[in-house]
Amino acid sequence: MRDYGFTYDFENFKRKIIGYVSDHFGDAYTVDETDCVKNNDTTYHGISLREKDSNIAPIIYLDELYQIYSNGESIQQIAESVIDHFRIYVNVPDLNLDEIDNYEAVKKRLGVKLLNRSLNSSYIEKKVYVEYMDLIIVFFLEYEDMSIGKGIIGVTPDMLSMWNIDTETLLRDATENMNKNYPVEFTSLVDLLIREYKYRFEDENNIQREDIKDIVEQLTSLSTYDRQLYVLTNESHNLGASTILYPDTLSKVGSALNTDFYLIPSSIHEIIIIPDNGNVNEEVMNNMIRTVNS
């Protein structure tokens, strides 16, 4: 059901949601439109809720909610879900940002991630970044609050000036943190897939158990030759492409494979490693890159 059978375009949908949220929380809060450019220069359209004199402004993005609305959900029900989301943050104490100007206090929370340079030109306009081959390294601060959960804050040039450090120091400290907190995992792609599918198979609510069992059996039966694609990531499988920045990582991969190898950035979470066994020509490599990134 829609409002009297009428379908709103996105801008009017957003205004209606803002109206519902504003009416619910009253004058003590302000509701603002907030657009955010994230990885691969994708722009997300959201709204934020801020209590007066607070430095917390939680955001909820409306793009997917509009698709749900377009598929038949009522705007009132969507507004209620948005309000429920914001209720989590009401009366939550401010994040402790008092130490953000103290580099020694915050550097243990620094991290890095690797992004595609050409797809993130807008994202890095107000960020500190370092070029790395055809990629870019960007930096963030992790925070964790018992009520809000985990989050990250991108490092900006203003923060770098406030800390009075150079980019080399930032890169060194952030990489050391990642190496300590997110250790390297290097495994064959087949073995990684087997683990992933077994995890799904063990989910008793999964309705495709037999299909998954068949896939696992097929993967397990692959020969050593067919297992020559490897994955470089970290143990959490989150932002694992940054492991190539860890000290000695690539030399250790070379020692493990006992040969030269090719690197194919698959996503921000992993790197595909292909040993140079003499059979990988330009056409084969291009096909692999297209397959990995498809």
Predicted regions and their residues:
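Extended, low-hydrophobicity segments enriched in charged/polar residues
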Residues: 7-224
